[in-house]
Amino acid sequence: YFRGYGNKVCVFFLPLRQIRAMKISFISLILILLSFVCQSQNEERTLVEAQLNKQGEAIILIKATDEQTDTLSRLVSLDGKKGNEWKAYVNQKQFADFLNLGLDYRCLPKEETKSVSMANSISQMESWNRYPTYDVYVDMMKDFENRFPDLCRLDTIGLSENGRLLLCLQVSDFSNSETVKPKFFYSSSIHGDELTGMVTLLRLCDSLLTSFESDSEISNLLSSTVIYICPLANPDGAYAGGNSTVANARRYNANYVDLNRNFPDPILGLHPDQEEFQAETMAFMNYAKKERFDVSVNIHGGAEVCNYPWDCWQSGQREHCDKDWFLEICNSFISDVREFSPIDYFTDVSYSGITNGGDWYVINGSRQDYHNYFLRCREITLEISTSKTPQASLLPRYWLYLGKGLVNFVSNSTKGMKGIVKDSVSSLVLDSVRIEIENINEDELFVYSKADGSYFRALLDGTYQVKFSKDGYEDKHICVSVASNGTTEEVVLMKSTDVSIEQALQTMDKSLIYPNPANDFLTIEINSESYYDVIDSRGIILQQGRLDVGRNNIQITNLQNGTYIMRLYGKDKKHPNKTMTFIKQVTK
């Protein structure tokens, strides 16, 4: 043992017995500390398992570096960062897989809902300071349609795993069918315990419908847009404790699957969470493919921020081609919200109130990325309350903060370019025409015309060179100017490179489809199993079905006299591989 005194060094010799004693004491101290750590982790594991046994899901806080979160996000359902710890939800399987990582964690008690005041009738929802029971929720959606049949239509997206209804209210001035209307989709509570948005969207339905006659901004909005509103995307999670209460609401669905990790992912493919598609996921995917939304917002709780794409990439890895557009509409929304809210609202994630999804934290399988990447629908995720299920008496405050912003978000995001694409000779509308903004790298995220020939492309103000393209047609180039806060409408006529309809009727293979003109029956012979639909000149599907190999007789007595198009599809039913024209002509 050495010790210095000034310029002298003194040497002390400790007895060997004392050195051994010190060594043993040090080892003992380490063992004691390790035992405390093990005991602590065992206690946390016991708490987590108790939550899992009671609720089927548990919340944990995990100590992990940013580098470890890539692996972590594929095993658990990350829900944000608290200091230097990551908040995550786990089910039984996820927790077992997580334990193999050997990371430190602790159990987080589930957020207590201080006051779950439930409405047992529609009249009890008049003050908007209660949560509806499941039956009242369904009754409210039906009541909107019954009271305002000219302004809304109630649609069923599908059924949950437990058979509860996934409802959507289509709100628009349906008497005005002359203009092309962009389709906007609001949905909430894909995580069943995030219920601020559920009540807020119910109130949005009520406000739009009751204000239509008296508010010119609302009437103008509904005359030019179709707004789809699904207040509750995960009813099994919201009413996990039974249809009469949301007191035991949980994040996951009935199978303890996070629905916002269950969609196809741009990086990890069809099943990023290693789970089968849930009934809710399939329903929303099919509904989105059918309706072909232009803009969408998925409302969550647990934070207060506008989250724009991507979720699976950080901004340094890949940016959405419409990043500037996303930032513009999000900034407008934040400005509207801060006009009516406390100064610290929408500041818990970033002071601006806006974040890139992956820069906040990376996840895979989100609906936002699915809509943007696979369906070309511009969607953001909107987190509206740090408390996932606030006490019911606070719910009116959130409408005060958000009401104007939610209405204006629809208006602002549906500005740009819209119109109809038609065949220049027959004037038949054209489906699946690609609309490409030239001189801009759109990263293959082009929009396409719909079955009725209509299209919408969200754009900031400016002048754009636009190309319309479709197999069998010459490319069409036009110059479009979009004014500030305006929408430019263009009818685009495209010239076919195929033979004309008249020529096609003269040279058509009579052994394939006959007679032509037809009376009450049409015969078609095909070489492989196919699916078909029949559309009119507006692109409206009037009839559809399946065709077997060989001769098929199709009854067309329901069709009026006129010219129709039959489209044949393969088993994927995605794009027609053959199009034929026939005439329905009943002679008297």
PLM regions: where:
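Short, acidic Ser/Thr/Gly-rich low-complexity loop/linker segments typical of extracellular
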Residues: 429, 437-460
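A short, solvent-exposed beta-strand micro-motif common in secreted/extracellular proteins
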Residues: 453, 462-472
